[in-house]
């Protein structure tokens, strides 16, 4: 299987580098169309998510249009642009982004407290991590290893050149605490469904979902500040990274702190998704824990 992944990766890489930018966009459209038509179960997940999120507030046609744009962005962001950014430089990455409300992060760094940046599978989140490290300093990202070991090595090598440390969420607690103690910016993607033992119930688009409390628990344990941040398209080849006001969990009632801080993270994600639904990664079964039957084909 690793050989198949590797062959596909290098074939796509060859095509991308020999094609002009206009044809790369056509390639992204083709890949998006093919993925949407061939992976029908995944398309059902996307439409189920859109129905659960927007209900009757959007028409079937509007939801289908969001889905099509989501597939295109997936092909462009995680396919073409991911490959184009292999072995890139900090200067080239920073030319692709502008920062909004960066004073929230800068002031938090000046405070000397640990910092946890939470985000979602939204926009070009791969560039997000590289750009933050390039502009603000070393960071550590909590995540899951890829199923393909060779692709995981490629991903890690790409991030390592920006001093972005990848920490496996399975058994990575000590490494995360070490990173926070060293005052590395710690990034966590917090928008996926979790196993019942790993999540707490919050509201997302007016629906019950499970949400990881990892950032909230770590913040309570280490006195860290939590900053929600998201990346989204600003122009044809430009993205904006927007930071929100820090969440200081130490100011909350201790018994309610984790629940409140986690809901705030989920609400920030919802607000961003409502504003730009086509940039969200709708492929996850976000509502599965409480709406499992809706996902059955």
Name each model-derived stretch.
Residues 111-170, 193-199:
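Catalytic core of membrane glycerolipid acyltransferases/transacylases, capturing the structured
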Residues 91-97, 144, 162-167, 205-206, ...:
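Short, flexible loop segments at the rims of nucleotide/cofactor-binding pockets, characterized by
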Residues 1-119:
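Membrane-anchoring hydrophobic helices of lipid-metabolizing enzymes
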Residues 38, 68, 107-110, 134, ...:
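Non-catalytic C-terminal accessory region of glycerolipid acyltransferases
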Residues 3-6, 41, 45, 127, ...:
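Generic alpha-helical secondary structure signal
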């Amino acid at each position: 299987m690793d050989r198949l992944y590797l062959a596909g990766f290098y074939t796509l890489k060859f095509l991308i580098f020999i094609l002009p930018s206009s044809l790369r966009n056509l390639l992204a459209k083709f890949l998006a169309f093919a993925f949407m038509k061939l992976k029908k179960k995944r398309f059902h997940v996307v439409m189920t998510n859109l129905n659960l999120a927007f209900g009757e507030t959007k028409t079937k046609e509007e939801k289908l249009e969001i889905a099509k744009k989501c597939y295109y962005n997936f092909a462009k962001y995680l396919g073409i642009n991911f490959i184009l950014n292999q072995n890139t430089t900090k200067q080239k990455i920073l030319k692709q982004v502008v920062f909004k409300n960066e004073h929230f992060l800068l002031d938090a760094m000046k405070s000397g407290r640990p910092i946890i940046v939470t985000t979602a599978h939204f926009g070009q989140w791969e560039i997000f991590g590289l750009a933050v490290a390039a502009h603000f300093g070393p960071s550590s990202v909590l995540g899951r290893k890829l199923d393909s070991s060779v692709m995981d090595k490629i991903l890690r090598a790409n991030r390592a050149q920006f001093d972005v440390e990848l920490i496996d969420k399975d058994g990575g607690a000590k490494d995360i605490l070490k990173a926070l103690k060293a005052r590395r910016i710690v990034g966590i993607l917090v928008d996926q469904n979790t196993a019942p033992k790993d999540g707490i119930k919050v509201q997302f688009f007016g629906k019950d979902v499970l949400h990881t409390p990892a950032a909230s628990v770590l913040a309570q344990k280490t006195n860290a500040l939590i900053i929600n941040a998201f990346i989204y398209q600003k122009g044809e080849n430009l993205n904006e990274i927007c930071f929100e006001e820090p969440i200081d969990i130490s100011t909350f009632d201790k018994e309610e702190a984790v629940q409140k801080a986690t809901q705030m993270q989920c609400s920030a994600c919802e607000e961003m998704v409502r504003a730009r639904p086509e940039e969200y990664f709708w492929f996850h079964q976000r509502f599965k824990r409480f709406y499992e039957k809706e996902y059955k084909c």
